[in-house]
UniProtKB/Swiss-Prot annotation:
Keywords: ATP-binding, Cytoplasm, Kinase, Nucleotide-binding, Transferase. Its EC number is 2.7.4.25. This is Cytidylate kinase. GO terms for biological process: pyrimidine nucleotide metabolic process. InterPro entries: Cytidylate_kin, Cytidylate_kinase_dom, P-loop_NTPase. GO terms for molecular function: ATP binding; CMP kinase activity; dCMP kinase activity. Belongs to the cytidylate kinase family. Type 1 subfamily. It catalyses: CMP + ATP = CDP + ADP; dCMP + ATP = dCDP + ADP. ATP binds at residues 7-15. It is found in: Cytoplasm. It comes from the Bacteria. Its main location: cytoplasm. CDD domains: CMPK.
Length: 212
């Protein structure tokens, strides 16, 4: 079984992905980490993010061993990842890695921006997670503070809105809800409430009931 979770930055899809994977005993892949790893490699090498050739080369040399690097969660790396993820050739290189992960038994949960539309269009369950931008900015600020980093909520909100515009407007795999994805708005849900709602969606789809 493949569960695809898509949504904008800081919508809570990563947390839901981890919890759903644990609940069902599936493997989990935060596909945003893939792009962040490539972006960090470019930043560490002093590369020009507008140089698509360098970005493609970094994607081809992706090292999964870097996925656990805490530095990948930084705002700088996140912004850089948003830039390179708009390059069609970079996405093309990384599609194979994601699809191979999804195909391995017993099942997988992948979260990102284009899982249900591009990476796994035939996923058994598709969930599109959204949340109010202000709520997302507040959550991101709290995460940064928990890591001991300074966090200006207004600056974070402005960045989130810019990233939303960039993700929705890019020509390569723009952020959008798949026609058969179930919408989950977790603006007013805590983590446990969001997890319960996501599990209910999975169970409803598995039972053949489209509406929940």
């Amino acid at each position: 079984m493949i569960i695809a979770i898509d949504g904008p930055a800081a919508s809570g899809k990563g947390t839901l992905g981890k919890r759903l994977a644990a609940h069902y005993g599936f493997r989990h892949l935060d596909t945003g980490v893939i792009y962040r790893a490539v972006a960090k490699a470019l930043l560490d090498g002093g590369a020009d993010l507008t140089d698509q050739a360098q970005a493609i080369a970094a994607a081809q040399g992706l090292d999964p061993g870097l996925f656990g690097d805490p530095a990948l969660k930084s705002q700088t790396v996140g912004d850089a990842a948003s830039v390179i993820s708009a390059y069609p050739k970079v996405r093309e290189v990384l599609v194979g890695f994601q699809r191979q992960f999804a195909a391995e038994p017993p099942g997988a949960v992948l979260d990102g921006r284009d899982i249900g539309t591009v990476i796994c269009p035939d996923a058994d369950v598709k969930i599109f997670v959204v949340a109010d931008p202000g709520v997302r900015a507040r959550r991101r600020a709290l995460e940064a503070q928990a890591r001991g980093e300074p966090a200006d909520e207004a600056v974070i909100l402005a960045d989130i809105l810019r990233r939303d515009e960039r993700d929705k407007g890019r020509s390569a795999a723009p952020l959008k809800q798949a026609p058969d994805a179930v919408l989950l708005d977790n603006s007013n849900l805590d983590i446990e409430g969001g997890v319960r709602a996501a599990i209910a969606i999975v169970e409803a789809v598995r039972a053949g009931r489209r509406r929940v």
